[in-house]
From Swiss-Prot:
Protein's pathway: Pyrimidine metabolism; UMP biosynthesis via salvage pathway; UMP from uracil: step 1/1
Binding-site residues, 5-phospho-alpha-D-ribose 1-diphosphate: 77, 102, 129-137, 204
Molecular-function GO terms, alphabetical: GTP binding; magnesium ion binding; uracil phosphoribosyltransferase activity
Source species taxonomy: Bacteria, Bacillati, Actinomycetota, Actinomycetes, Mycobacteriales
Family: Belongs to the UPRTase family.
Keywords: Allosteric enzyme, Glycosyltransferase, GTP-binding, Magnesium, Nucleotide-binding, Transferase
Enzyme Commission number(s) of this protein: 2.4.2.9
Annotated NCBIfam families: PRK00129.1 (NF001097), upp (TIGR01091)
InterPro entries noted in UniProt: PRibTrfase_dom, PRTase-like, Upp_B, UPRTase/APRTase, Ura_phspho_trans
Enzyme category, top tier: transferase
SUPFAM superfamilies for this protein: PRTase-like
Protein name: Uracil phosphoribosyltransferase
rRNA processing listed as a keyword: no
Names of the cofactor(s): Mg(2+)
Length: 213
């Protein structure tokens, strides 16, 4: 599995805003949108393109577009804050949804929504989730996508914990070499606290975007 940490001054600045407990909901959402743009930009750097001839006001030239735009899959509810900006950069992309809630006693994911195409065998997928903590929600999502035939899966996360990275690496190994799994993140933090929150992290990304449940 390929893991790429986006190292850029602008990404670091937006991450600082997300971490800052003084940032209100609006500031948090704005920083998340900006950082999502950077993650998508990095993640699409090597995707296949197809060429075509276009005419400018003065001449013909060669233009390019994505050969096979990805399916965007935000993991609800925190992933909602990433999907609009990802869609803005890839307007031809389709969008699916996976809804997940965390059991605060067991820390295990409780799925409540799956809205995905039945056949993903020829479809690249971008999974959008700001936080990769224990990895439970992401592993569930990866397994769901793999069961539908997805063989090219890219995860975009703002903050990751080593435990979560290990969990998805083990999941990718179970899929075997026929499935490509990549992670793009702005940082890999120190670890998890006793409540399974990322440290230093940025708190609950859903609450900080939309308010408490």
């Amino acid at each position: 599995m390929h893991v790429h940490v986006v190292e850029h001054p602008l990404a670091a600045a937006r991450l600082t805003t997300l971490r800052d407990a003084r940032s209100d909901n609006a500031a948090f959402r704005t920083a998340l949108r900006d950082l999502t743009l950077m993650l998508v930009y990095e993640a699409t750097g090597s995707v296949p393109v197809e060429s075509s001839t276009v005419r400018t006001p003065v001449a013909e030239t060669t233009g390019y577009r994505l050969a096979n735009p990805p399916l965007l899959v935000p993991v609800l509810r925190a992933g909602l804050g990433m999907v609009d900006q990802a869609h803005a950069l890839i307007p031809e992309a389709r969008v699916g949804f996976v809804g997940m809630a965390r059991d605060e006693d067991t820390w295990q994911p409780t799925p409540y929504l799956e809205s995905l195409p039945a056949d993903l065998s020829a479809q690249p997928v971008f999974v959008l989730d700001p936080m990769l903590a224990t990895g439970g929600s992401m592993v569930y999502t990866l397994e769901l996508l793999h069961a539908r035939g997805a063989a090219d899966i890219t995860m975009l996360c703002v903050v990751a914990a080593p435990q979560g990275v290990t969990a998805i690496q083990e999941c990718a190994e179970r899929f075997g070499p026929s499935t490509s799994v990549r992670l793009f993140t702005a940082t890999i933090d120190e670890g998890l606290n006793d409540a399974a929150y990322i440290v230093p992290g940025l708190g609950d990304a859903g609450d900080r975007q939309f308010g408490p449940r």
